[in-house]
């Protein structure tokens, strides 16, 4: 696992083997960020990373110039690893919270340019993520929600669904806040 772009490009991440995670593969992450390069400007954006695990995605956004990256995971071991890694590489824009993601979303009052969610594949509440994010008005106008999930799972029922990209057994489903971007 490595950072593929930005100021920390090439940095190898070596999380402890006992973390309860399934990190996004380098191949899938590189494909995701290539898609995003054509859609958003990373410099200065505000990102919410749900089920952040090792922080692989959070650190990638921070490396590429995100102004603020909020990472949420319920594992104290993942939270501690990401806090330590962020501190070690002076990524002050990464803020890490130990919390159940669904509880966090119910309390969240901020809005983001991008929300990324990589829940455990066996989580039966994955289809609820877009519903909650949009009900809570967590995305800025024009902003994206990206949910990583098993390719065999379909979560395209939400009206804000834009597209799904498959990478082997993993897929990214994209949702866009279609609210007036001029507001």
What are these regions (language model features)?
Residues 1-183:
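Class I S-adenosyl-L-methionine-dependent methyltransferase catalytic core
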């Amino acid at each position: 696992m490595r950072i593929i772009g930005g100021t920390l490009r090439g940095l190898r991440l070596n999380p402890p083997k006992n973390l309860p995670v399934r990190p996004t593969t380098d191949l899938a992450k590189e494909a995701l960020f290539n898609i995003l390069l054509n859609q958003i400007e990373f410099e200065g954006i505000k990102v919410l990373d749900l089920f952040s695990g090792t922080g692989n995605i959070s650190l990638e956004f921070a490396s590429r110039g995100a102004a603020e990256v909020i990472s949420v995971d319920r594992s104290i071991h993942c939270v501690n690893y990401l806090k330590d890694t962020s501190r070690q590489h002076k990524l002050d824009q990464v803020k890490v919270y130990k919390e159940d993601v669904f509880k966090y979303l119910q309390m969240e009052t901020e809005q983001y340019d991008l929300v990324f969610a990589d829940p455990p594949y066996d989580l039966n509440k994955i289809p609820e993520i877009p519903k909650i994010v949009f009900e809570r008005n967590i995305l800025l106008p024009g902003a994206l929600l990206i949910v990583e999930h098993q390719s065999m799972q379909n979560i395209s029922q939400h009206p804000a669904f834009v597209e799904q990209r498959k990478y082997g057994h993993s897929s990214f489903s994209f949702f866009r806040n279609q609210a007036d971007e001029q507001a």
